[in-house]
From Swiss-Prot:
UniProt KW keywords: Endoplasmic reticulum, Hydrolase, Nucleus, Protease, Thiol protease, Ubl conjugation pathway
Localization in the cell: Nucleus; Endoplasmic reticulum
Domain (USP): residue spans on this chain: 80-375
Catalytic machinery residues: 89 (nucleophile), 334 (proton acceptor)
Name the UniProt record assigns to this protein: Ubiquitin carboxyl-terminal hydrolase 17-like protein 17
One Pfam match: HABP4_PAI-RBP1
Biased composition (Basic and acidic residues): 382-392, 398-411
Catalytic activity: Thiol-dependent hydrolysis of ester, thioester, amide, peptide and isopeptide bonds formed by the C-terminal Gly of ubiquitin (a 76-residue protein attached to proteins as an intracellular targeting signal)
Cited function: Deubiquitinating enzyme that removes conjugated ubiquitin from specific proteins to regulate different cellular processes that may include cell proliferation, progression through the cell cycle, apoptosis, cell migration, and the cellular response to viral infection.
One Gene Ontology term from the biological process aspect of the record: regulation of apoptotic process
UniProt GO cellular component terms: cytosol; endoplasmic reticulum; nucleus
Length: 530
């Protein structure tokens, strides 16, 4: 077999088989059909991290990948707390989880991107680099996140933390790409962000009439888990990869025998990410009501049972961050997170407050988003820290992190926002708004009869609600310090120049929250006759 490929007019055609059909351009993934079930799939992976062999020629034709630092530059102890700027707990909780993602933090602290970045403004990677550097190098303090981090997303009210998380991840991925508009999907899959968070699904359909097999590979950055019938993350993953029978009206139209026939469909993870983002689907898309049930999740998770290739030994991930939502629906509540510092100690990051936490407390939360990293990756970064010079350990006086100068007390949530450090934060213009981004997400999806995120009340045009309680009545009893306050818009609303240009964002839900039974990308088919 020849190990080469041809690039013709935007189409990738592989010369690995005797007969090929023309592939459609601008494909997000490839579909391969075979006439019989082989003993070993020709698309099997040599390693979990790289693309499968038959897709490798595509990756080799692309620009070189950004290299991740081999050694850790991350301080061992926990960093700063984050000031709540008014309904921004969802921003703070998400940022803390990203800040304590070892591969991302080490890359940011190396400053490799900013030294070669050609964007004069609006670069999310540069903005995140400034934030992560400040957060990790200011233990015992409370810092104000840059307004540019949420520009185009935050509208003065609470939003969904997972949506903001993927908004940020997608913006960082776009910042890795060249400046020109037309970039193929394969280039996006070689970015720094895809190296850290990305992997590939393998959707395999076997025709029960001719035994032909169709393999479809689809990239992912996070994994959404249905928890309605699951008591644990492992059960939710088992349901996700459980074979599905296609028959009757749902019969499969086989591209080999060219007829509708019963088939078996199996979804598995073909390549594993360095960092897994597992999203527990707690909110109804229609009503916004929350599934407020306890779903067990382990400190160590073996992903091998859910991979395409078996019998290759355990693939162990360790938990390092948990994003928690406290409340009863997406319309109310409060977000905070737990993170694991490089030293191994867990901390609760609740806006400005940073307190030490036990693993028992971490594992007993009603988690919304779970962050796992491959055990080998975590150990590599931990060993690098232990060999290097560590900052001072977290003392008892730092356990409850509140600002010592101009202390941020929760009974005084109304604070005048200080000016941002100009040498750390870029000024940019806003092109993409949250409304536009959500419109792009929903344009191919059937919309409900009413808007579940509709603002129920109308405020005067000259006021802004600061950190309004999402618990309604319940928050007043348990968190009186988080009740609503008002701040003049003239002192808190970012100017047009302070907003960040994130560009036009592609649909995240159709890609990040992949449904088991649907293909949400255009496909290109390669018909193989053996």
């Amino acid at each position: 077999m020849e190990d080469d490929s041809l690039y013709l007019g935007g189409e990738w055609q592989f010369n690995h088989f005797s007969k090929l059909t023309s592939s459609r351009p601008d494909a997000a993934f490839a579909e391969i059909q075979r006439t019989s079930l082989p003993e070993k799939s020709p698309l099997s992976c040599e390693t979990r991290v790289d693309l499968c062999d038959d897709l490798a020629p595509v990756a080799r034709q692309l620009a070189p990948r950004e290299k991740l630092p081999l050694s850790s530059r991350r301080p061992a102890a926990v960093g700063a707390g984050l000031q709540n700027m008014g309904n921004t707990c969802y921003v703070n909780a998400s940022l803390q989880c990203l800040t304590y993602t070892p591969p991302l933090a080490n890359y940011m602290l190396s400053r490799e991107h900013s030294q070669t970045c050609h964007r004069h403004k609006g670069c999310m990677l540069c903005t995140m680099q400034a934030h992560i550097t400040r957060a990790l190098h200011n233990p015992g303090h409370v810092i104000q996140p840059s307004q540019a981090l949420a520009a185009g997303f935050h509208r003065g009210k609470q939003e969904d933390a997972h949506e903001f998380l993927m908004f940020t991840v997608d913006a960082m991925k776009k910042a890795c790409l060249p400046g020109h508009k037309q970039v193929d999907h394969h280039s996006k899959d070689t970015t720094l962000i895809h190296q850290i968070f990305g992997g590939y699904w393998r959707s395999q359909i076997k025709c029960l009439h001719c035994h032909g097999i169709s393999d479809t590979f689809d990239p992912y950055l996070d994994i959404a888990l249905d928890i309605q019938a699951a008591q644990s993350v492992q059960q939710a993953l088992e349901q996700l990869v459980k074979p599905e029978e296609l028959n009757g009206e749902n019969a499969y139209h086989c591209g080999v025998c060219l007829q509708r026939a019963p088939a078996s469909k199996t979804l598995t993870l073909h390549t594993s990410a360095k960092v897994l983002i597992l999203v527990l689907k707690r909110f109804s898309d229609v009503t916004g009501n929350k599934i407020a049930k306890n779903v067990q999740y382990p400190e160590c998770l073996d992903m091998q049972p859910y991979m395409s290739q078996q019998n290759t030994g355990p693939l162990v991930y360790v938990l390092y961050a948990v994003l928690v939502h406290a409340g009863w629906s997406c319309h109310n509540g409060h977000y905070f997170s737990y993170v694991k510092a490089q030293e191994g100690q867990w901390y609760k990051m609740d806006d400005a407050e940073v307190t030490a936490a036990s693993i028992t407390s971490v594992l007993s939360q009603q988690a919304y988003v779970l962050f796992y990293i491959q055990k080998s990756e975590w150990e590599r970064h931990s060993e690098s820290v232990s060999r290097g010079r560590e900052p001072r350990a977290l003392g008892a006086e730092d356990t409850d992190r509140r600002a010592t100068q101009g202390e941020l007390k929760r009974d005084h949530p109304c604070l005048q926002a200080p000016e941002l450090d100009e040498h750390l934060v870029e000024r940019a213009t806003q092109e993409s708004t949250l409304d536009h981004w959500k419109f792009l997400q929903e344009q191919n999806k059937t919309k409900p009869e009413f808007n579940v995120r509709k603002v129920e009340g109308t405020l005067p045009p000259d006021v802004l609600v600061i950190h309004q309680s999402k618990y309604k009545c319940g928050m007043k009893n348990h968190h009186p310090e988080q009740q609503s306050s008002l701040l003049n818009l003239s002192s808190s609303t970012p100017t047009h120049q302070e907003s960040m240009n994130t560009g036009t964002l592609a649909s995240l839900r159709g890609r990040a929250r992949r449904s088991k039974g649907k293909n949400k990308h255009s496909k290109r088919a390669l018909l193989v006759c053996q």
